[in-house]
């Protein structure tokens, strides 16, 4: 009973999953292993980009061919969700989200982070840490605020009182709950996948975990696609001109 009460006396901010390697910078306490694996993912993406663009060929092959397919896929995704007139400036943002999440998710399954020993905690996919996914969600929020404001100016905030003024608090809450729901879904899926595979490897270390790992790779790719698609959809929604559409319908 005392242990139960002691658990609930712990502040929520101190609750955490597993142990962490902390870096103390002034009054800030950072999760060091998240920075290490994030830098690894960024390094992989930078090296792949340099390798693909260092010797560009008219008929692409190898890494150049792979990244050109990825770019076409991201362009189509952004065009479908944002619209043909507005999508081009947002391709880098949507592409960065998709590629970072995709490589982060797959790194947790394919890279043997567990073999690298740290003073505390252990390395894992960046997206298995709630700090990473919430940061991505907040970037998404800032992106569609900027998209709506740059397209409509102060008129963007008129959407918050449409169709009736008492919708204002609900619209404000919705702006933050949409990307945050994405962040918790991404965090939960990647963390659960790593935990399940880790337990199976301990119990049956040979071939049984392989189908689960393959399923984890598939769901990891789907989670990256969902996050990027909905981020693009939110940006497109913020720039959507309802008045212009109504005017065209009357004509």
Swiss-Prot record:
TM helices/strands, residue ranges: 34-54, 93-113, 130-150, 195-215, 216-236
Residues spanning the signal sequence: none
Localization of this protein: Cellular thylakoid membrane
Location (main, coarse): membrane
InterPro entries named in the record: ATP_syn_F0_a_bact/chloroplast, ATP_synth_F0_asu, ATP_synth_F0_asu_AS, F0_ATP_A_sf
SUPFAM superfamilies in the record: F1F0 ATP synthase subunit A (SSF81336)
Any one GO MF annotation of this record: proton-transporting ATP synthase activity, rotational mechanism
Domain of life: Bacteria
Keyword annotations: ATP synthesis, CF(0), Hydrogen ion transport, Ion transport, Membrane, Thylakoid, Transmembrane, Transmembrane helix, Transport
Bilayer topology term: Multi-pass membrane protein
CDD domains, alphabetized: ATP-synt_Fo_a_6
One GO term describing the cellular component: plasma membrane-derived thylakoid membrane
Subunit (UniProt): F-type ATPases have 2 components, CF(1) - the catalytic core - and CF(0) - the membrane proton channel. CF(1) has five subunits: alpha(3), beta(3), gamma(1), delta(1), epsilon(1). CF(0) has four main subunits: a, b, b' and c.
Similarity remark: Belongs to the ATPase A chain family.
Function, in words: Key component of the proton channel; it plays a direct role in the translocation of protons across the membrane.
Name of this protein: ATP synthase subunit a
């Amino acid at each position: 009973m005392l242990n139960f009460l002691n658990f609930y006396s712990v502040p929520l901010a101190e609750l955490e999953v597993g142990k962490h390697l902390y870096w103390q910078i002034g009054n800030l306490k950072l999760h060091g292993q998240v920075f290490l694996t994030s830098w690894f993912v960024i390094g992989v993406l930078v090296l792949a980009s340099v390798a693909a663009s260092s010797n560009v060929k008219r008929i692409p092959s190898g890494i150049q061919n792979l990244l050109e397919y990825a770019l076409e896929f991201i362009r189509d995704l952004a065009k479908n969700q944002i619209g043909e007139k507005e999508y081009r400036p947002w391709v880098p943002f949507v592409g960065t989200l998709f590629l970072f999440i995709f490589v982060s998710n797959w790194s947790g399954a394919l890279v043997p982070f567990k073999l690298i020993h740290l003073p505390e905690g252990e390395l894992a996919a960046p997206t298995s840490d709630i700090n990473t996914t919430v940061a991505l969600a907040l970037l998404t929020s800032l992106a569609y605020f900027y998209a709506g404001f740059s397209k409509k100016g102060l008129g963007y905030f008129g959407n918050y009182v449409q169709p009736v003024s008492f919708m204002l608090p609900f619209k404000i809450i919705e702006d933050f709950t949409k990307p945050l729901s994405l962040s918790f879904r991404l965090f939960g899926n990647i963390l659960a996948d790593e935990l399940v595979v880790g337990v199976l490897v301990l119990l049956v270390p040979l071939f049984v975990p392989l189908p689960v790992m393959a399923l984890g790779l598939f769901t990891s790719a789907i989670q990256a696609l969902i996050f990027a698609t909905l981020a693009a959809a939110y940006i497109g929604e913020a720039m959507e001109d309802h008045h212009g559409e109504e005017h065209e319908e009357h004509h």
